[in-house]
A protein has these predicted regions:
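Short, charged low-complexity linear segments at domain edges
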Residues: 154-156
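Donor-sugar nucleotide-binding helix/loop cap in glycosyltransferases
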Residues: 1-152
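A short acidic/basic microdomain associated with nuclease active sites
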Residues: 182-191
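A short, highly charged nucleic-acid-interacting micro-segment common to nuclease
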Residues: 158-175
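Internal, well-ordered alpha-helical scaffold/interface segments
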Residues: 174-178, 182
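Short secondary-structure capping micro-motifs at structural edges
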Residues: 33-34, 164, 191
Length: 191
């Protein structure tokens, strides 16, 4: 599962950028400057909102899809994108027992590290809470869980996601191959 799509995403930062865009739709430069004063990870946050079709950039203009309940709106947008929703759905399944009851989740250290980007995003959105004493995680917002669990994707959406992942993997393989080739040429120029 690709939990890294949530790397450097923090709900308060996302909401701050969204609100700044609402207040300054005609001046993206101002939005960036205001955001950067108190927040971090501007590019990741901006790309995330653009990828979810919450924001659209046209020159220095920012087109914003407006919604009064930002948290629910954001989750709804995430559900529409398999790139984000599949890791989210997979991770949240850990909070469901075999009897279909909500339980606390205590991941092993490897999974905890692997899923840390997504987990930290959920903690920042007050969907999950870390209990330090028992070192487990508690689901705070079960309404979001139900919504995400019920989400489904068309075969076309899943095929497109698989195609995109294959293209990304192929590009990475080509990059590694080229680097190895250059390293070999340093050793022996006749290769």
């Amino acid at each position: 599962m690709n939990f890294e799509v949530f790397e450097n995403l923090d709900f308060p930062n996302i909401k701050k950028l969204y609100n700044l865009c609402l207040d300054n739709e005609k001046n993206l430069s101002l939005v960036k400057n205001l955001y950067a004063r108190e927040n971090r990870d501007l590019q990741e946050t901006l790309n995330f909102l653009i990828d979810l079709d919450v924001l659209k950039i046209s020159g220095n203009l920012v087109l914003v899809k407006k919604n009064d309940n930002f948290k629910n709106f954001l989750i709804d947008r995430i559900i529409l994108k398999p790139k984000y929703s599949l890791p989210l759905k997979n991770y949240l399944q850990n909070y469901i027992s075999q009897e279909n009851k909500v339980i606390n989740f205590k991941p092993n250290s490897g999974y905890n590290i692997l899923s840390s980007s997504l987990r930290n995003f959920l903690i920042s959105a007050n969907i999950v809470e870390h209990n330090i004493e028992s070192n487990d995680y508690k689901l705070l917002d079960t309404s979001q869980l139900d919504k995400i669990r019920k989400s489904e994707y068309s075969p076309e959406q899943l095929d497109l996601e698989i195609k995109n992942q294959k293209e990304l993997g192929l590009a990475a393989e080509k990059l590694v191959f080229e680097k190895e080739r250059l390293n070999l040429l340093k050793i022996d120029k006749n290769l």
